């Protein structure tokens, strides 16, 4: 008797779940997909790998694009990897040329500053393996990490892949991109001073 009641309860729960899911999927989607190339690039520039996008407010988005390919942006020193794009796909501003090797993660802090994780390094040109803070106008305000150097220390990263800034200004950097990375989270204060770290591969 108990088994019968349990079976009935499970069947009713399954039906209710199905109905709930069906009503969710039946809702109208307020968004539309854009076919073809949406962003209008300057003449002669080709679209490469898009590593990240982030909402900038007022319908605009920040886009990080790997300079027409998916490799070292320093090899194309005249191309800006960071772009601010409006709702119609027009580039409002761009910056970062000859500064970023391989843009990965992106974050906009409460003050509107843009943070970029540069997840690869170019030791010969002393760039990469850093996290950069830019103003909304593209002025470099801060860099955390040792330029072009891969490792594991308070201020040395190995493929930092993302960054987030808390409301109080504390900075959290996800350091590592794959099995060969450090795969840790490093915390700094708003001035870029080391506080602590946690996590490791497999944790």
Q: Model regions: which residues?
A:
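Bacterial N-terminal signal peptides that target proteins for export
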Residues: 1-11
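Bacterial N-terminal signal peptides
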Residues: 9-20
